[in-house]
Amino acid sequence: MENTTRRLPAPNARRCAFTGYRPCKMPFGYDEDSPLGRDFRKRLRETIEVLILQGYRHMISGGAQGMDIIAAETVMDLQKRYPDVTLEVAIPFEDQAKKWPEEYRARWQRCIDAADMLTVISHEYTKNCLYARNRYLV
């Protein structure tokens, strides 16, 4: 898996990066269809839309389970309304999703496939690749 650019963000585009809790630490766990999960997605969408309206045009997801993937999916949906918004997925290593539950692997792959840019920090897992990805995000 190589770094891929399908579409570059506009020059000097304001950027916002997303990373956060994994499902096991989310108040709704893996049940995103629960009332808490639906409320979280609604509030996240509203927040990202406010950022877009404030001029943020390049969104970066860390690609992890939980917040990262939910944010990427939200951006993908908002791109229908705001086609000038770009999505970058920055993953710490190529096989990041290899040991994940099948549903999350499929969601991860959809995010990778839809991303305007894919940034691969390391070809294989290293003890520092997650820190390097986080540094890249900020």
Model-found features: residue ranges?
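Acidic/glycine-enriched connector segments
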Residues: E2-V138
